[in-house]
Amino acid sequence: FGTDLSKQASIEPDNVPFIVKKCTNEVEKRGMDFEGIYRKSGRTLLMKILIGIFSKGDDPDLSEEGEFSEITIITSVLKQYFRELPVAVIPPDAYSKLTELITADEKDLNILEIKKCIDSLEISHYNTLKYITRHLIKVSEYSSVNLMNIKNLAVVFGPTLIGSNEICPEVDFSSTGIKVKIISVILENADTIFPDDK
């Protein structure tokens, strides 16, 4: 927690941090029909314990029979992990470029330019964004039960994956809508942005 994404991802063969895969796999196993998945928060004490286990490099038991049986603990820890990254999954330079592309006229939205911007991300950032995008699409496929469609997931993950502007928080607060839009566009156009052959 709080350490560089590239450093953590580099020890994994697919360049996606272990914690991201561990948490999302458990969500896909038993959390897809949980109403408000990723929107509801887990208990703080258990979150702190789980963060401590991951921070030591250990492999926690996330099964339903274990200490972290509440799926909201796992989803909250994953969101916290993304929030604490020193450089967000979508770093400031890519965020600036995507903001220019997204705030252009809707009918002129150039998905290939957005793809080009995302393609330029460092490999661990690219692979992690691709991985979490695929996961969130799977979650949205259960939206009739979990009530988390693409828009709702983008509201949760926009500020989480894009991070914050600590130098000027009021500007960052006003840009939350843009972050949500960026994640919405990525989720809605995932097959174009992340073709399987890359």
Predicted region positions:
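Alpha-helical catalytic/interaction cores of small GTPase-regulatory modules
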Residues: 1-198
